[in-house]
Amino acid sequence: MGISKALRSLLILLLLNITFFFGHVTPGATVKPCPPPPAKQATTKCPRDTLKFGVCGSWLGLVSEVIGTPPSQECCSLIKGLADFEAAVCLCTALKTSILGVAPVKIPVALTLLLNSCGKNVPQGFVC
């Protein structure tokens, strides 16, 4: 019983395809993993509206008169939920644009007072 020419041609073609496929696949080939996404850069912009930080200015005027008086809830609620760095950036921006009416020389002190009074810390190495 003989195999027909068409079937024989089909089998030869199939064998050639299998040979070609396995002949070109290297046994040690590995898939290169995707590189990890870049680390999230610390933003240098305030995620909140800087003009709203004007409510913190009235408290800064009272610091010299009544030491220990906490800033208004409005002021602290603006930085609530922000990381220390983000809160520092927001207050620094507000201080630099004179929204809070602080002399440039007193900006680092005012920034520290506001952040600490609202339960935040000035990040290490942060310069306003």
Curated annotation (Swiss-Prot):
Signal peptide segment: 1-23
Entry keyword set: Disulfide bond, Secreted, Signal
Cell compartments where the protein resides: Secreted
SMART domains linked: AAI
Any matching Pfam family: Hydrophob_seed
A single cellular component GO annotation: extracellular region
Disulfide cysteine pairs (residue numbers): C34-C90, C46-C76, C56-C75, C92-C128
Entries under InterPro entries matching the protein: Bifun_inhib/LTP/seed_sf (IPR036312), Bifunc_inhib/LTP/seed_store (IPR016140), Hydrophob_seed_dom (IPR027923), Plant_LTP/defense-related (IPR051636)
Family listed: Belongs to the plant LTP family. PEARLI1 subfamily.
Name of the protein described by the UniProt record: Putative lipid-binding protein At4g00165
Organism: Arabidopsis thaliana
